[in-house]
């Protein structure tokens, strides 16, 4: 079932790590960021070993992660879900769109559309997904002849954005009640609606969300606290330390950074560009000189008797930050 999957890797023991019961350490969900990053790299580099690994990973995703007939995306291998997790759908759609320039298989794009259609059929318009760029999917479909699919997704997306604008800063709870990556999708989606339509009202609607997002940011001189959005529970879920406590940085902090970079590109806001680039570069400290990486850094000295001030040894899904760096750093 796991043939071709990219799994977590424990840098201390030198072994792969897999836990089907603890779903943040399985082969799906955020782990798909590894394949997304590899696809982005292979768009500009030639490497036969990496290409072979990508093909095996895509085969795994098609076999185990989603149903091409229905667009359903699953939480676990063998196309199994104990509950609906809408976060997963756009990530798989993004993965297929990133792989398309490498493999040139147009069914990847038609599958990417079906997944987004399934996402909206299951209530996605009331959800705030993170790490997804719907405008780019719309434009990719159009550029590759999927005109009807592009128009349908555009309609769904703009209706989704209208709900976000209407709701304002009364954010709905998701897997937690309130956190940084409930705000980042509001900024990203409203901004993409502006870039699609050039409707100036979106630039006005985005301002309260930008103000809310900035409240998560550290402004201290140390690189782990400088334009890094604070997060609290990530090392409990994504690393074997399993400790609560501020994770500074965690790769999802970079979602704030790319929102600032995209906003600067649309408006010419040089200060937000500086802050976005700074925060995204700071997140790259999760990648070590020896080629290993960390899912998060537990920042406090100690949390409930557990030693902190260290990088978690598990290489989990931090490759999203590297993907964003490839995509957005000047």
Model-found features: residue ranges?
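Extended, well-ordered alpha-helical scaffold segments
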Residues: 45-64, 103-122, 146-168, 198-216, ...
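Solvent-exposed loop/turn segments connecting transmembrane beta-strands
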Residues: 125-126
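Helix-terminus loop motifs that line ligand-binding clefts
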Residues: 48-87, 218-224
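An acidic-aromatic substrate-binding cleft motif
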Residues: 1-62
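Terminal, non-catalytic domain-edge segments
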Residues: 159, 163, 189-330
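Short amphipathic alpha-helical interaction patches enriched in hydrophobic/aromatic residues
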Residues: 169-172, 264
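Well-ordered alpha-helical scaffold segments within catalytic/enzyme domains
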Residues: 22, 30-48, 90-105, 121, ...
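Carbohydrate-binding/catalytic loop surfaces
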Residues: 2-23, 70-90, 132-147, 171-192, ...
